[in-house]
Regions:
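Bacterial N-terminal signal peptides that target proteins for export
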Residues: 2-11
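Solvent-exposed, well-ordered loop and adjacent helix/strand elements within mature globular domains
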Residues: 23-364
Length: 364
């Protein structure tokens, strides 16, 4: 009997096995101490997740599998315990498992919690991001007037130094050049593809940030009483700034945040977790609150009004992504991703999937 108890972990018909084996097996969430779950998280059933039965969770499993290729580490976040997430990586179902099997696996291994904000509300803001393709140059030209830099190789400090000073003093290693507006967009998105004059493509991924606050470009235009044709959508703002280069330099340099990049031999988009991002299955979240690698179920709407109910994985972060119910959905690369991502701004609910912990007790 004892050996059977040891090998039983968790399957959909666990209760039947427990009865047969005579085991006393108690189930606990988080790390066995529910008092460590913040009070703004409330346990719910999977039936409470809108559209849960309709989502093809196999794609979310693949995103989680990518997460498992990196070591999930605790870096000061509130929840959950990184070791518990990493343990689930040793229990993944087959990559060929059908939807029902994968759904049952998530239901057996994770407990959903609905997230509430500080005021007790259960909705938050969802935006989108993508990996742009921009024109670039190996040397400075009239068209390519702004450097794209990697972190300083001489160990020079860049933390707490504003963008304007970093660029003017060249605190970093110049990788390539591009239009200043495109470089700002690249920094906001966190990664992108550079198309050089000879047609070759270079992949640039996030390397580091100067830890300065982000100041909205569109917000600055509003403060100045400047309204681009088409309003304050990202597309309208970027177009207006390209038509007004002096203004562009003023407002872009007035945003002190600066992002460094590195050239990647792979064309995959790499998030802060260090693993490739998956289109509409990877999400950027506040890693001061959530351990990267956490499965999260999002219920919101896309910019065209369609319902968006998806199981995703927190694999990235963003300078403006702060708070309990705040996330940035990764929509992929290229023009189509751009159209969806730049129009995305909706309210919705968030459910996080906390790893279950099973405590085994010898049979009496």
């Amino acid at each position: 009997m004892l050996n059977l108890c040891k090998i039983i972990k968790f399957v959909g018909f666990l209760a039947l096995f427990v009865a047969m084996a005579g085991c006393d097996l108690s189930v606990k969430t988080y790390d066995g101490d529910n008092s460590k779950v913040p009070s703004n998280l409330r346990a719910v059933s999977y039936s409470s997740l809108p559209g849960w039965r309709d989502d093809d969770v196999r794609y979310a499993l693949q995103a989680f599998r990518n997460t498992c290729k990196a070591k999930i580490q605790y870096k000061g976040s509130v929840i959950p315990d990184a070791n518990l997430l990493q343990e689930k990586c040793n229990m993944l179902p087959s990559s060929t498992a059908d939807i029902a099997t994968v759904r049952a696996w998530f239901e057996s291994h994770f407990q959903p919690y609905q997230v509430y904000n500080e005021k007790g509300g259960k909705t938050g803001t969802y935006t989108g991001y993508y990996s742009p393709v921009i024109d670039g140059c190996k040397k400075q030209t009239a068209k390519c007037n702004e450097p794209i830099m990697g972190v300083p190789i001489n160990g020079a400090n860049y933390k707490g130094i504003a963008k304007k000073d970093i660029v003017n003093k060249k605190i970093g290693r110049i990788l390539y050049w591009a239009n200043i507006v495109d470089v700002q967009n690249l920094q906001i998105q966190g990664s992108g593809m550079l198309k050089l004059e000879d047609g070759s493509l270079v992949k640039l991924n996030f390397a580091a940030v100067n830890d300065m606050p982000f100041k909205s470009i569109g917000g600055q235009l509003q403060e100045r009483g400047i309204k681009p044709a088409g309003g304050y959508s990202a597309d309208a703002v970027w177009t207006h700034l390209k038509q007004n280069p002096k203004l562009a330099k003023e407002v872009i340099y007035n945003n002190p945040r600066y992002v460094y990049f590195y050239e990647s031999p792979q064309h995959s988009v790499i998030g802060k977790l260090g693993t490739p991002l998956s289109k509409i299955r990877s999400v950027a979240m506040d890693d001061s609150l959530y351990t990267l690698g956490l499965p999260v179920y999002i219920s919101t709407n896309l910019s065209d009004g369609r319902a968006f109910n998806r199981l995703m994985v927190a694999q990235d972060t963003g300078g403006a992504i702060k708070g309990w119910i705040r996330a940035d959905i990764f929509f992929g690369s290229g023009d189509e991703a751009y159209k969806v991502a730049h129009g995305q701004h909706s309210q919705g609910q968030m459910f996080i999937l906390m790893p279950k912990v099973y405590t085994y007790v010898k049979p009496r």
